[in-house]
């Protein structure tokens, strides 16, 4: 069993572990800045009982550092209507932020 938590960040719920890298939808924070994640849904540490928030845990924060902002690989959307000569091709690249979980 390892130490892990489930957090709510940028509209997504993530299972996170210490000393690991994660990417989520863009967060408007400068690169290199440390942030405290306080929207924790569940926390499990080795040798302790699992803590479940309702909906969030109070008084607990997870420290993280912003590493970079980048674009995800391009997704191509191609729409076509048969027998109509109607074709539409669009591309989209999502803005993402990568961060490192330091400690709980």
Curated annotation (Swiss-Prot):
SUPFAM superfamilies cross-referenced by the UniProt entry: L21p-like
Function of the molecule: This protein binds to 23S rRNA.
Name of the protein: Large ribosomal subunit protein bL21c
Superkingdom of origin organism: Eukaryota
Family according to the record: Belongs to the bacterial ribosomal protein bL21 family.
PROSITE patterns reported in the protein's UniProt record: RIBOSOMAL_L21 (PS01169)
Species for this entry: Cyanophora paradoxa
Membrane-spanning residues: none
UniProt GO MF annotations: rRNA binding; structural constituent of ribosome
Subcellular location: Plastid, Cyanelle
Keyword RNA-binding: yes
InterPro entries named in the record: bL21-like (IPR028909), bL21-like_sf (IPR036164), Ribosomal_bL21 (IPR001787), Ribosomal_bL21_CS (IPR018258)
HAMAP family tied to this protein: Ribosomal_bL21 (MF_01363)
GO cellular component term, pick one: cyanelle
GO biological process, one term: translation
Swiss-Prot/TrEMBL keywords: Cyanelle, Plastid, Ribonucleoprotein, Ribosomal protein, RNA-binding, rRNA-binding
């Amino acid at each position: 069993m390892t130490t892990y938590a489930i957090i709510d960040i940028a509209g997504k719920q993530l299972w996170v572990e210490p000393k690991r890298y994660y990417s989520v939808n863009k967060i408007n924070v400068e690169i290199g800045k440390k942030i405290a994640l306080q929207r924790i849904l569940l926390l499990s540490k080795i040798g302790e009982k699992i803590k479940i928030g309702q909906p969030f845990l109070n008084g607990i924060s997870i420290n993280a550092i912003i590493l970079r902002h980048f674009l995800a690989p391009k997704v191509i959307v191609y729409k076509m209507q048969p027998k109509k000569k109607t074709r539409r091709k669009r591309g989209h690249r999502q803005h993402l932020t990568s961060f490192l979980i330091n400690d709980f």
